[in-house]
UniProtKB/Swiss-Prot annotation:
Subcellular location: Cytoplasm
Principal location: cytoplasm
Domain notes: The N- and C-terminal flexible termini are involved in oligomerization and in the binding of non-native substrate proteins, and are essential for chaperone activity.
InterPro entries, per database record: A-crystallin/Hsp20_dom, ACD_IbpA/B, HSP20-like_chaperone, HSP20_IbpB
Domain sHSP: 26-137
Name the record gives this protein: Small heat shock protein IbpB
Superkingdom in the source lineage: Bacteria
PROSITE patterns noted in UniProt: SHSP (PS01031)
Organism: Yersinia pestis
Family recorded in the similarity comment: Belongs to the small heat shock protein (HSP20) family.
Oligomeric and partner information: Homodimer. Forms homomultimers of about 100-150 subunits at optimal growth temperatures. Conformation changes to oligomers at high temperatures or high ionic concentrations. The decrease in size of the multimers is accompanied by an increase in chaperone activity.
Listed NCBIfam families: PRK11597.1 (NF008618)
A GO CC term assigned to this protein in UniProt: cytoplasm
The gene coding this protein: ibpB
Length: 154
């Protein structure tokens, strides 16, 4: 398995691997909520956000153009609690990811405190690379092609 070193500036740009590998430096990434960006192959990506304590109804995913935005707004706690130690954070957040061209949200699941967003690259057939078969002419075909009396040249 490969690890891709994305600079902090481009951590939220998904599908721009060549661009990301050429850029250096950047800004501090957002600390909450923690998330992973996984690349399983050239056409499949997954964003996983750790959202312990959130309910599915408190989360919203929106795609507008190339921007994927994930928002969370926890419901207020009815009874105030005095924490001796607070390690779990439940605060409002908004994360925006910039998706590469032809990268679309395929699926989203919230399970065991993790929000998984699956992305799929779907390049139209007309834009995909084409393989051209290279053939070799038989000796008889070569004579026809090299002949000055070929039917095309009259």
């Amino acid at each position: 398995m490969r690890n891709y070193d994305l600079s902090p500036l481009l951590r939220q740009w998904i599908g721009f691997d060549k661009l990301a590998s050429t850029m250096q430096g950047g800004q501090e990434p957002q600390g909450f909520p923690p998330y992973n960006i996984e690349k399983t192959d050239d056409n499949h990506y997954r964003i996983s956000l750790a959202l312990a304590g959130f309910k599915q109804s408190e989360l919203d995913i929106e795609v507008e153009g190339p921007r994927l935005t994930v928002r969370g707004k926890p419901t207020p706690v009815e009874k105030q609690v005095e924490y001796l130690h607070q390690g779990l954070v439940r605060k409002e957040f908004s994360l925006t990811f910039t998706l590469a061209e032809h990268l679309n949200v395929d699926n989203a699941q919230f399970e065991n405190g993790l929000l998984h967003i699956d992305l799929l690259r779907q390049v139209p057939e007309a834009l995909q690379p084409q393989r051209i078969a290279i053939g070799s002419a038989t000796p008889q075909e070569r004579q026809v092609l090299e002949s000055p009396e070929a039917p095309d040249q009259q």
